[in-house]
Amino acid sequence: MSSLRFPYPHRYDTRVVNSAWRHLDLGGRVCVLKLRRRRLRCPGHGVLAESVPFARPGSGFTRDFEDLAVWLASKCDKKTVSTFCRVAWRTVGAMCSRVVAEKLDPDRLAGLVDIGVDEISWRKHHKYLTLVSDHDTGKIVWGAPGKKAATLDGFFTTALPEDGAKKIEAVSMDLGPAFAKSVRAHAPQAVICFDPFHVVKLATDALDDVRRQVWQSARKLSDKQIAKTYKGARWALLKNPESLTDTQKATLAQLKREGGALVRAYELKESLRAVFVGDLDTDTITNMLGKWCSWAQRCRILRFVKVGRTIKKHLDGIQAAVERGLANGRHEGLNNKVRLIIRRAYGFHNAEHALAMIMLVCGPVTLELPYHT
């Protein structure tokens, strides 16, 4: 008992609490540490059992066991972790929350200058998380459930240190109004940059909508082979030409021979992507975007007419992103990691555990295996 810490110096009574903690297995056998803890009185928290140095408060596992399980959870799927550690996946989720709360860099929000904001779906039925990343470090530094302006308001009002919002110079985001509204309210000096990735995504989504419309029209015809071709052409149209397989190249060539609105939509998408692919100066990109918007207005494809109007409306923010070299491409790379985490975990039961795992893998958290220290 002499090795125990005493954060609460006043003993409450002579009763003890019989406690047990799961430790790292010994020779393939489950190892459990048992200890009788004194009850102490804290003026702020009431009667509590004394803390121990080898386990986190409220945990039934030792620090070494939790660190091992959480490290595995950042690398493996949940079934592997559950089987190897012989614990439930929900238990691993709680471990991740405790470890992240302890090891997350406390200075991650200090001195933020250029940030990226984006939302990602963590569960079906419109369950979203808003994630904020630091463009300088490439790490996710904050997250919260939801994707509205009020969600990002919490970042500025409660998460950032005092005057932290005043130091932010630029924020990259998608073209939706919610995040821009929050930034204008809390960091009016910051330049709003509409990420080129999301600009191209507008055209990509529009192209897929046109493909669906053509497919639905073809289904009504007697020749079902035509409908099958359109249905299977999704990735041939959406992927970059240099990434196509031989089969997809053949499908795309067939569509080009047939012509029509779908091919025009594909050419519009590719021409917009080409604007941001090369290392062009701002004036050239602005000129190319203006010509593209004019083309979109004349194309007689309703979805692309709308895309052209949207780009024209947000042209200042797109120019700002190009001038500052800010794009959510790195943030989208983080989002791809997040999507992999969600797939690997087969979903999460609550947003807290989802955020903990995201911060564990993509945030400023340093993890070490217990026997490597």
Kindly label every feature range from the protein language model.
Residues 3-8, 12-126, 166, 181, ...:
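Short, positively charged, Gly/Tyr-enriched micro-motifs
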Residues 124-126, 134-137, 145, 158-189, ...:
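Acidic/histidine-rich catalytic cores and adjacent linkers
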Residues 19-31, 41-43, 97-169, 184, ...:
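Basic, low-complexity intrinsically disordered segments
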Residues 34, 57, 61, 73, ...:
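Catalytic cores of large soluble enzymes that bind and process phosphate-bearing ligands
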Residues 11-12, 149-152, 202:
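A short local loop/turn or secondary-structure capping micro-motif enriched for an aromatic residue
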Residues 36-37, 84-95, 136, 175-177, ...:
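Core catalytic machinery and nucleic-acid-binding channels of phosphodiester-processing enzymes
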